[in-house]
């Protein structure tokens, strides 16, 4: 398990290998939640992803390495735009 949604508390993510991966999973889950709220606001029934396609996506995009890798541009942007972060 990489993430949990706690009622009245918010999101929690984790990683076995790196803080970067946990941070990326948090950002990705936050974006998913935002998308879900926008879909719900339309009043249209969402089109669900078939289980086999969801499983394929998890197996190819859900690895710890991919989480770490996808956080690298975010980290680069933070370092470039917030240099005082290290003071």
Features from the language model and the residues they span:
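A conserved C-terminal secondary-structure "cap"
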Residues: 2-87
């Amino acid at each position: 398990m990489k993430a949990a949604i706690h009622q009245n508390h918010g999101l929690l993510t984790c990683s076995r290998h790196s803080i970067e991966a946990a941070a990326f999973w948090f950002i990705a889950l936050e974006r998913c939640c935002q998308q879900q709220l926008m879909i719900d606001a339309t009043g249209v029934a969402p089109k669900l992803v078939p289980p086999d396609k969801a499983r394929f996506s998890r197996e190819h995009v859900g690895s710890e390495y991919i989480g770490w890798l996808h956080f690298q541009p975010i980290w680069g942007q933070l370092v470039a735009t917030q240099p005082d972060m290290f003071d």
